[in-house]
Amino acid sequence: MNEMNEAAVRSGWLRCAEAARLVRWGAAIAMSAAVLAGCGSMRQTAAPTLAASDAVAIAPIANFTETPAAGGSAAALAATILRANGLADVRLAPVDGDGNAMFDTAQRDTGERRLAWAREHHVKYVLAGAVEEWRYKAGVDGEPVAGLTFELVGVESGRVVWSAAGTRSGWSRSSLSSVANALVGRLLAPLRPRS
């Protein structure tokens, strides 16, 4: 009888130890999620229904930072991610002859010039945007940080059909390109064809 009591006590202790271990793991996962969630923020509207064959032109992305070519880097990332999302016809819109962005979002040119080019090239949507932040923070750690806004304009209506804004920062050993890639990927994730 005494052996049965000892076995029951041991079994109870083992269950308690297992439960404590699961609680510790759960707490560690919750803390990790909280830390990662604090690394950025994102806001966006509902995405339109896209077909894999819809042509999307990426307008030159405005660069409101002190980092040279941040807009070009963001546009290249956006084009690659949209293709990876399943859109077959993703194009980079040209700059004009003076080297100026054809779709200068700094001047909020949403007029006929942008839409006329898109119509002439049988584009259904134009993705415009701006880089708000693209740098390494000053200080000992020098964490990378990126901030972007995007607007998807329906060429037929000339109206914004989807928009998103987001920021993301990394740790001191992260690269700016990996932080920017993750941010652009999350922002553009809803822009994928639906079957």
Model segments located where?
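Solvent-exposed loop/turn segments at secondary-structure junctions
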Residues: 63-66, 96-99, 132-137, 168-171
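Charge-dense, low-complexity intrinsically disordered segments
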Residues: 26, 65-69, 170, 174, ...
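Short, positively charged
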Residues: 6, 131-133, 188-190
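C-terminal/domain-edge helix-coil "capping" segments
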Residues: 39-54, 75-76, 87, 117-121, ...
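N-terminal segment of the mature soluble domain
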Residues: 52-53, 60, 65-121, 159-163, ...
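Soluble periplasmic/extracytoplasmic beta-strand elements of cell-envelope proteins
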Residues: 57-60, 126-130, 147-151, 163-165
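Sec-dependent bacterial lipoprotein signal peptides
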Residues: 1-39
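Hydrophobic beta-strand positions
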Residues: 94, 152-153
